[in-house]
């Protein structure tokens, strides 16, 4: 594990969280890393796809690798099946203990291509509105909203909402 990069994530100073978060091949296994500040427990839950011959997959508990809420698990798989996180939070003064299920935005590749970026930089991308902003879509069976903004001088950009308790440390976006 790359501790300087983990610190960049926990301090919200990382300009490419996809480089660390989500699934990454490690030999014949996959290292899955996630950041959920304040969570006590995170489990990888395999979605059932209904494919013929699909093997039964056991949920994988993730290890709390950093007390700031950084979790990791080494999964015995050369390729990741569709999954989601089950995140458990303990009781605090503000709220009772609860759990939530959420997808992993970091398992998806950017929807803005190098060609899009080159055309935009040259001032000839006449349909950039199709790429920037908020766009509901489905990627690899995950339904959600894709976000992209042009913020060349921003130190960090995050997507926030009630789905992440308006916490800007979560759902950090990558600089393209």
What positions do the PLM features span?
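Non-catalytic, glycine-rich low-complexity segments
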Residues: 1-38, 97-155
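Aromatic-rich carbohydrate-binding modules that target alpha-glucans
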Residues: 23, 33-80, 86-103, 139, ...
């Amino acid at each position: 594990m790359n501790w300087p990069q983990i610190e960049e994530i926990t301090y919200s100073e990382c300009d490419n969280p996809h480089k660390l978060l989500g699934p990454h091949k490690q030999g014949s296994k996959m290292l899955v890393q996630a950041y959920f500040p304040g969570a006590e427990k995170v489990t990888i839950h395999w979605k059932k796809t209904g494919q013929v011959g699909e093997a039964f997959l056991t949920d994988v508990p993730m290890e709390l690798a950093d007390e700031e809420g950084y979790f990791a698990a080494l999964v015995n798989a050369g390729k990741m099946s569709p999954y989601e996180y089950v995140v458990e939070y303990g009781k605090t003064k503000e709220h009772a203990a609860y759990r939530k299920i959420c997808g992993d935005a970091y398992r998806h590749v950017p929807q803005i291509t190098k060609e899009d970026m080159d055309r935009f930089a040259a001032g000839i991308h006449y349909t950039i509105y199709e790429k920037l902003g908020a766009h509901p879509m489905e990627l690899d069976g995950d339904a959600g909203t894709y976000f992209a903004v042009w913020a060349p001088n921003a130190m960090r950009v995050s997507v926030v909402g009630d789905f992440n308790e308006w916490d800007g440390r979560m759902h950090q976006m990558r600089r393209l």
